[in-house]
């Protein structure tokens, strides 16, 4: 994997920095594990915008990724690594000994031809999945469940991981990348290693059009709007907004805490770093 900074042969390539991975499959994805993906433009069932800055973009297929890894005791061989337009991480197509193929998140260091295994008796090596109670202290893990059997929800993006720092009865304590220390049931599953494609954060798209290809629309500043559109809007000439920064709905931004899920506060040992 290499970081390539393009020469300024055009305005769009002047700031283009891309990640080149020659291990990625260049052909078509595995068709039985594809699903249709319709665009919403950020609108809900009433046609109202619920998520801003979404719309357009290239048509994509959804890759059905196995986040549960429940095929215990059946070894699988990595056939190839693939690009996935739906996430920052790459995915791996694996062939199980019983003939079934599945997509999984590709951890760092996994290559075509490697073998992986799920279950209690799996060896301690990247790509293998097992319950948290069977993972040694200090291990780096990813694709972590929050509830047993629900599927991975934590540490799924490129370059992310968590560290297992303590075990206490029915719970284990994890240190997340944000600095948060959190308790999770020890029956939840996780995969060893960190997610690959960590260079993803170093890329630069180079031009606005590259964001539009990905379905991302422009972000307009509130002070550039009219008063009907934003609390910072209006005024004669350029203004500072006239108040502390807020969202379009008047909620303070820039560090204002909005977490309201008190029910799960008991699982958070230490809040994330600011």
From Swiss-Prot:
Entry's Gene Ontology BP terms: cytoplasmic translation
Keyword terms: Ribonucleoprotein, Ribosomal protein, RNA-binding, rRNA-binding
Residues passing through the membrane, by range: none
GO CC annotations on file: large ribosomal subunit
Keyword set includes Ribonucleoprotein: yes
PROSITE patterns given in the database record: RIBOSOMAL_L2 (PS00467)
Family according to the record: Belongs to the universal ribosomal protein uL2 family.
Alphabetized NCBIfam families for the sequence: rplB_bact (TIGR01171)
HAMAP family named among the record's database cross-references: Ribosomal_uL2_B
The protein's name: Large ribosomal subunit protein uL2
Record organism: Colwellia psychrerythraea (strain 34H / ATCC BAA-681)
Taxon lineage: Bacteria, Pseudomonadati, Pseudomonadota, Gammaproteobacteria, Alteromonadales
Gene name of the record: rplB
């Amino acid at each position: 994997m290499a970081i390539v900074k393009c020469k300024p042969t055009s305005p769009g390539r002047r700031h283009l920095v891309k990640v080149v991975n020659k291990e990625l499959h260049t052909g078509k994805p595995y068709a039985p594990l594809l699903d249709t993906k319709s665009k919403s433009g950020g609108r809900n069932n009433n046609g109202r915008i619920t998520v801003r800055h979404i719309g357009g973009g290239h048509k994509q297929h959804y890759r059905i990724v196995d986040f549960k890894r429940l095929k215990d005791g059946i070894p699988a061989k990595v056939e190839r690594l693939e690009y996935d337009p739906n996430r920052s991480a790459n995915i791996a197509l694996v062939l199980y000994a019983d003939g079934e193929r599945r997509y999984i998140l590709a951890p760092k260091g996994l290559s075509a031809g490697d073998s992986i295994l799920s279950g209690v008796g799996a060896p301690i090596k990247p790509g293998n999945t097992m319950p948290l109670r069977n993972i040694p202290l200090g291990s780096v893990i990813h694709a972590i469940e929050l509830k047993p059997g629900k599927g991975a929800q934590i540490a799924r993006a490129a370059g992310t991981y968590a560290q297992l720092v303590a075990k206490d009865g029915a719970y284990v304590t994890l240190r997340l990348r944000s600095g948060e220390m959190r308790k999770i049931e020890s029956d939840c599953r996780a995969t060893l290693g960190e997610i690959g494609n960590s260079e993803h954060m170093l890329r630069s798209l180079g031009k606005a059009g590259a964001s539009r290809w990905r379905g991302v629309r422009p972000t307009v500043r509130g002070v550039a709007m009219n008063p009907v559109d934003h609390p910072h809007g209006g005024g004669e000439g350029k203004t500072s907004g006239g108040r502390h920064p807020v969202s379009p709905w008047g909620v303070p931004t820039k560090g204002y805490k909005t977490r309201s899920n008190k029910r799960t506060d008991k699982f958070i040992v230490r809040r994330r770093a600011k």
